[in-house]
Amino acid sequence: MFQGASSLSLDAKGRLSVPTRHRDVLVATAAGLLTITRHPHGCLMLFPRPEWEKFRERIAELPMSAQWWKRIFLGNAMDVEIDATGRVLISPELRQAAGIAKDTMLLGMGRHFELWDKASYEAQEAQAMQGAMPDVFKDFSF
């Protein structure tokens, strides 16, 4: 399970250094193989390959009424591998789709990660914090 936030920068070639605490788990559980695709909230999702395969099956089973969402998730998916120095290449197409130029936030979201443009993430987080909490949290104890 992945959790926590990391402020990271892409290098000039669009590569992201995976934090060591996540890299070790990804190498052990997924042989360093990841799949990256678009998220409907404007960020990217990074899945360890075994988790991607489960997600892909669920998406593939959706009805024809969800065809565009199948295209968004599956048609934009790119398989990548963590290189010898712990980096993954974020394709230009995916960087453009998420508005990512250099500064990013990598968020552990349990079984996958979200990769955000840092400024976009900070703005959306601030907006969410100013709003009311969703009803699902009304009986949640902190």
From Swiss-Prot:
Q: Does the keyword Transcription apply?
A: yes
- Gene Ontology CC: cytoplasm; nucleoid
Quaternary structure annotation from Swiss-Prot or TrEMBL: Forms oligomers.
Q: Name one GO molecular function term.
A: transcription cis-regulatory region binding
| Residue span, SpoVT-AbrB domain | 5-51, 77-120
Q: Which Pfam families match?
A: MraZ
Organism listed in the record: Verminephrobacter eiseniae (strain EF01-2)
Identify the coding gene: mraZ
Protein name (database record): Transcriptional regulator MraZ
Classification via Gene3D superfamilies: Transcriptional regulator MraZ domain
